[in-house]
Structures are given as C-alpha cells and as structure tokens.
Amino acid sequence: MPTIVSNNEVKKVPNIKPLNTGPLNKIQFSNIIFPFGRTFGPKIFGELAQKLSEYSPNNNGIKIPVPGEGLPRVINYCADQSGCAFWRMIWPGDELLANNRAVIMTLYQMVTLGQFYGGIDAVRLQRQCTEPQLEFIKFLRNVSDQMKQQTGKGFRIIWEVDDIVCPAVDIPDYNVCKTAFEGDTVYNNVKEMMKYVDEATVVSEHMRQHYKKHLGFDKITVIPNYAPKSWIDRGYDEKQLRRKYNRKGKPRVLYAGSGTHFDVTNKTGQKDDFGHVVDAIIKDITIDKKYDWVFFGALPMKLKQFIGKGIEFHPWCSILDYPQKLREMDVDVSIAPLQNNAFSRSKANIKLTEAGMQGIPCVAQNIDCYNSDGWKYLFDTAEEMFKKVDQILRTENSYMEACKFAREYSEKFLLQDHLDEYTLLYTTDYGDIKRKENASFLKNNPEQFV
C-alpha cells in the first residue's frame, strides 16, 4: 500500500542502521516512516488521511480514510507454496485484505531489517523448524522487545503448523516427507522456538494436545481450516444431484489426496492409509464390480495396475481449479481412509469440506479428525466403509439427505464467517477475554478461558 508523503518529509527520514547491525539501545524509532504507511512519533494516520483528502478533487471537506487505517497489520512468512500455505496463510490473508479487516503482507524471504517491522501487530511464521529459522525467530523476538522498550509497543510472534513435524517417531514411515524431519535437530529447534514465540496455532484439538505434550508449551490455539467461498463454492444444485443419482451406470466413488498417504517407496510393505481397505477395493474391481473408482491426485501402489481397468485416474491440478475438477468428475460419494496414528488423528477435516461443498458426501475414517464435529458417515473397517457407501446410495432420498448434510456441514467452515478469529489472534493475547466473546473461538479453544 503506497504512503502519500511530500518530498520534504521523505528527506527528513534519518539514515537508521538495521537493528541487527548496530547497538540496539541506540536506535531511535520516532519519526521513521515504516511499511504500510505507518509511523511512530508525530506522523500518524490522521495526518495521512488529511493528505489523501487534499488529493481528492471533490471531497467537499469530507475526510477520506486511508485504506487500512486502524486495522491490524500482520506479516506472514510461508514455508511452502502448496495447499498448506494457502489454507493456513495465503487465503486468510487475502480474505482479510479483501474485506478490509487487516493489512497482511505475505512473504517467503526472511527480512532482517529491524525497521521493516515498525507498526506491525503480529508476525506469523508457518512450519519453521530449521536452525536458520530458529535464529530468525530469535531476531524477531529481539526486534519486538526493543520496539516495546523504545515505543511501548512490540509485535506478537506466532508459530503456525498444520501437521505433526515432531517428534519424528509420530510421522508415519510410509509418508515420503518424513525424511525431512528425522533426527533430533528439528525437534530440538522447535522446542527452542517456543521460548521466543507468543503463541502457536494448529488445525485441531488433537494436534494441540500433541504439541502441548511434546513441546511443553501451553499457549496453543486451534484455528480450523476455513475455505474461501470464492474458491470452494461452485453452487449446490439439487436437480443436478438427482440427475446424477438416476443416471445409468455404476455409482462413482472418489478418493482425492496426495501421495503422502501412500507407501510410494514400499518402506512399510504398503501398510499405509489405504492398507486396511485396498484389498476390498481390488475385490470390487475384479469380482463384485459394484462401483466405478475414481482417484484424483494419487493412488495406492497396489491399484496402479487397474488404471483404465476399473480405476479412472486424474493427475493433480492447480489448486485454483480443484473444486471445479471435483464437480466435473461427476462422482456420487467420496471416501477418506486413514491409518489410525497420531499423525492422522491430528489432521484437519478438509476431506469432508472440499467434497461436501460440492454436495458430495464423504465416508470417512472414524478417528479424531473426522468424528469430533458431528460428521455421521464414519467407518472403522473396509466392510463398514462399503456398508456406509451402500447406505448413502440405497435410495434417492437417502442420497439427497447425505448430500444436503454434507453441504450444510461444510458451510460452517467458510472463511468469510471466521475472519474475527484471525483478527483476535493477531491483536489479543492468549486467553484474552475478547476471544471468549467469539462463539467459534470459544468452541475451538475452551481451555483458554478455564
């Protein structure tokens, strides 16, 4: 966001050294023009608003507010550019910006210029676990503390994670990403980081309990994965759903997911998230032939031989196209098997909401990530999975009931309805009474207010 200042004012900005290159107790922050048009000292938003009004040819004496005036100001540091970053960092930031609820800057490159953080309310860092990232968090703590000492206001430092990254023993061996987190270094780095952050955010209560136990850190807040309506909502058409149910041919059953769910290197002998259901699927493909199977993104190694022979496979696509692709596949039901382990139990519920917003009911594993919020189509064994699919598809009425349930459940997780949870995260301390006044924040984090 540009800052409108005169040339004379720009010349008045002193040549200040970065915080990491000079004596911290000698650095003056007053009268420095900071990012996002914010200043300490005599330069305040009211003056900038006045200047903007002077540039308007038809203001008739009415003050024109600076975009973002008085809003929380946040810097996001992302660890990836895939789904994790979009769900946890990019989409919330974009939605807050678009609705004029906060001013968010999303970055990947670490910025070690102290003045850059002037006027910031919070810095949120995604899945930081390396030694350089630890040093960066120490730097941020130092900058925030010095700003608070000199100006009365620092910024909050928030560590964000949406998966189990430590201890490595709790990452399944079949997950090909495990090698990046093995050994003691990552675990020790993350434990050390907790000494310097104000709060951590996770996707689920089970994940909160996991990190509380293993990191010895209590200030952990649950913010579920909320989806932007503009991305996930492609409409809900009951006539189309009825047409799909009554079409000729076998019902179409979908699995959509990444290769991290499968033993792609054969490290565990195919004992992965599909280990308990894959043989039953093969039996249906080769003998019973009751369903058509659709896999989107990846599939178990045992099923590769059936591509084009009972299995329809679609490679991964741009995340922007993902909801529309789900609709175009014209599937009736989706499934979400998981191995019952700490990693799986801590997951978010996006398998339910991604399909559910399209009116596609999901038959999901009966573990914490899916059974803790009222979802009713659950299974433990392969036999139960098939029974639940049959139950949904038994009649047109049972199918429409399941589609409606899936849609209504998913609508509870639209990002536009949960922006206050993010602004509270950025502007209030852990356990602040203002958080308790937000019904969703209280529901997901009752322990903060005990």
Segments (PLM) and residue ranges:
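N-terminal pre-catalytic "stem/leader" segment of glycosyltransferase-like enzymes
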Residues: 2, 11-131
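Acceptor-binding helix/loop patch of EC 2.4 sugar-transfer enzymes
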Residues: 15, 158-187, 230, 235, ...
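Conserved catalytic-core segment of nucleotide-activated headgroup transferases in glycan assembly
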Residues: 80-95, 226-328
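Membrane-proximal helix-turn-helix segments that form the acceptor-binding/catalytic region
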Residues: 142, 146, 165, 179-200
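Donor nucleotide-sugar binding/catalytic pocket of nucleotide-sugar-dependent glycosyltransferases
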Residues: 195-212, 216-238
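Nucleotide-sugar-dependent
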Residues: 263-272, 320, 324-357, 364-374
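A charged, aromatic-enriched C-terminal amphipathic alpha-helix characteristic of glycosyltransferases
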Residues: 397-431, 435-437, 441-442
